[in-house]
């Protein structure tokens, strides 16, 4: 009898809470987000490599919490034209997603990654593709490093929309292009690994993806010298309230900046900030339904990233020259340099990667008596880059022989 009495009271209390209109809101313990895999399915990838990539993606999703109120996944192929293998709302379990990835056919064709990225942007925010509003968005791009079109502009558009970009490159690729494309910091979001060694990074990458989907509290990411991105768990809904973000430079209360955001927002990017400066950040949830405590955070922007300021051309020969630059930045601030050299009149472009801490390199195989444009680009750990250019001219290919002075022959007298 006591059991039925307690059960009846519990059911009555649950019904009363439902009728009262009190909104509990989503909890921060279960990650929510839309995860899009962008796989290079073009002819530049061998069938063996593609099969290894499919196994890798299957490993990633194996233990992730998928479901209508948790994570959702979609897969898009890179080829001559992008192709959706499955949408976000097509599968609701990790096993079903694994099975779909395992049988996904390679599409072949050209490697039009830029076109596929523009398509992925539409998919990530399209309700007809199963995407959800107000949840974190993550894109994982697995590539062999080659692309037939530009990836920079569409990648930047995705990041401007708050999408976190992870890149796994199984080939060399263009270091600067991939650094600029991945979210910051690069050491967390960009991986270079042989296709047979992909399982080595699966656990680390899976954890980073889930962290991006589920911030346990207000936190900062993509910290640069002039801005940073804030993320927080879904504390409100669009109908239950709104947020006020406050940004205060250290010791400058009069310079406070405020931004009001809807209740379904989970991220915001502050820009136009000062380098090497402490900022006090406050997230103030405003709701008439329930009381939520403010969250506070201190963030320090990075120091100004100074790229090459001077280029010196020396040791100029018909088919080679030496390029030096200053200042030489160490590995604490930069990942390295890319030196590019091409004829001003048009022609093939030479490029050399130089490790951090070095500030010179010799470029061989040039054309005699030709003017070149030399560009030195520093790639920073933040994912940004700075470049400086100068002109250089190789020496003539003809060697001028200076005649030796004639000496009097033996037995002859000088007049």
From Swiss-Prot:
Leader sequence segment: 1-18
Tell me the disulfide pairings in this chain.
369-393
UniProt keyword Acetylation, yes or no: no
Localization in the cell: Secreted, Extracellular space, Extracellular matrix, Basement membrane
Q: Which gene encodes it?
A: Vwa1
What SMART domains is this protein classified in? FN3, VWA
Residue ranges constituting the VWFA domain according to the UniProt record: 34-213
Which segments constitute the Fibronectin type-III domain?
214-305, 307-405
Q: What is this protein called?
A: von Willebrand factor A domain-containing protein 1
Species this protein is from = Rattus norvegicus
Q: Which residues are glycosylated?
A: 264
């Amino acid at each position: 009898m006591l059991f039925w009495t307690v059960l009846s009271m519990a059911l009555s209390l649950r019904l009363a809470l439902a009728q009262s209109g009190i909104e509990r809101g989503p909890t921060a313990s279960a990650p929510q987000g839309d995860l899009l895999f962008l796989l290079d399915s073009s002819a530049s990838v061998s069938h063996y490599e593609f099969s290894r990539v499919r196994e890798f993606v299957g490993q990633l999703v194996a233990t992730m919490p998928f479901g209508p109120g948790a994570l959702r996944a979609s897969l898009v192929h890179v080829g001559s034209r992008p192709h959706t293998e499955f949408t976000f709302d097509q599968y609701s379990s990790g096993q079903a997603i694994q099975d779909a990835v395992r049988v996904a056919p390679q599409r072949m064709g050209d490697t039009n990654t830029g076109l596929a990225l523009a398509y992925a942007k539409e998919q990530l925010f399209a309700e007809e593709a199963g995407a959800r509003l107000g949840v974190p968005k993550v894109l994982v791009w697995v590539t062999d490093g080659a692309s037939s079109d530009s990836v920079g502009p569409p990648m930047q558009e995705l990041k401007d929309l708050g999408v976190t970009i992870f890149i796994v490159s199984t080939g060399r690729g263009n270091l600067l292009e991939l650094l600029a494309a991945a979210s910051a910091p690069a050491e967390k979001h960009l991986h270079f690994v042989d296709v047979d060694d992909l399982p080595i990074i699966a656990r680390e990458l899976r954890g980073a993806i889930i962290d991006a989907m589920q911030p346990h509290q207000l936190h900062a990411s993509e910290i640069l010298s002039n801005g940073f991105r804030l993320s927080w768990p879904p504390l409100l809904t669009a109908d239950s309230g709104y947020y006020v973000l406050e940004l205060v430079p250290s010791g400058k209360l009069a310079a406070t900046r405020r931004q009001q955001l809807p209740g379904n927002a989970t991220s915001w990017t502050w820009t136009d900030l000062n380098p090497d400066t402490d900022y006090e950040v406050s997230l103030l949830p405003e709701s008439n339904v329930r009381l939520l405590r403010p969250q506070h955070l201190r963030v320090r922007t990075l120091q100004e990233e100074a790229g090459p300021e001077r280029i010196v051309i020396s040791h100029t020969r018909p088919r080679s020259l030496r390029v030096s630059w200053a200042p030489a930045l160490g590995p604490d601030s930069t990942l390295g340099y890319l030196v590019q050299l091409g004829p001003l009149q048009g022609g093939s472009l030479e490029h050399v990667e130089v490790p951090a801490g070095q500030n010179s390199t010799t470029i061989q195989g040039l054309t005699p008596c030709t003017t070149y444009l030399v560009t030195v680009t520093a790639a920073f750990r933040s994912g940004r880059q700075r470049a400086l250019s100068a002109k250089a001219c190789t020496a003539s290919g003809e060697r001028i022989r200076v005649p030796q002075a004639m000496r009097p022959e033996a037995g002859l007298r000088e007049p």
